[in-house]
Amino acid sequence: MRSNRFYLIILALIVLSYLATALIDNQYPFFAGFAILTLVVMALAWNILGGYGGYVNFGSAAFFGLGAYSAIVSYQLFAAPLMIQIFVAGIFCALLGLATGYLTLRLRGVYFAIATLALLVVSETLIHNWDYVGGAAGAYLLPSRTLSLFGLLIVGADGGLFSNNKEFLFFLLCVLVLVTIIICRTIENSKFGRGLAALRDNEEAAESMGVPTLKLKLMATMISAALMGVTGGFFPYYMTFVEPTSAFSLDISVNALAMPLIGGTAYWLGPVLGAVVLGTLQQVATVTISSEINLLIVGLFLVGFVIFAPDGFLGLIKKLRKRGD
């Protein structure tokens, strides 16, 4: 019964996200919403390995950036449409996550964190020096103003389901967020999720009990990397321009790590809550003050929650409920 209600809510949110694109004329809400939803997916994806499995990953921006550049390469090589670009980005980053995980997941603690940070640095350096994708100068991706599928006009100012690409991408990202939530919720309630929790709590004990820890970590890394890559695949199509400094920004890794910790890593709702609250504050700060203070906001929240509420928003709410009882 509870599961049916959950999926009905998901369906209702998909319908609402489409209605929003049809009823709202101002384009800024879609821009701000796109930025916040990107953070939600990144936070959820990070939490699969970092929260459920206990492996702190500083390389989220590497998968995001490589997903963005995978889309650029597929567009330049084959003039691939948006959905193919996103698919290529997800597959490439999943395979890269598998390879990276195999090389690094035998490391633990700070050594694993440093290895993932090194992946970010190496990835950005390679793209900086790859002229085919624009190198340090970046590359443009100019989407068509119309998009049709099986004769149906998806994007078009005259009679399309969406009047422009920004609205279409916002809707697609809403769907991706909801799909990611379903994936994370399924992991939490599965044998896979219980195995990740076991290795997070005590990896040696889990191994001695026969839990296939390496297999679980590789699966978690693949899923996490694929979701980050797919999110990155949206980036050049939405911005129409991508360059290494923004695609591989350390801000992306910091946000992906901090938002689950602030929201709470035990359940999928924690990363969503952390990303929505902090993402909204960042958008408000960008408009009213300056985007330069966005990381300051994240840092202050992170320090405060580490000291006063180490289990995040959800843990704090749970404690307050217990006190009330």
What does each of the following model-derived ranges do?
Residues 1-325:
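Transmembrane alpha-helices and adjacent helix-loop boundaries
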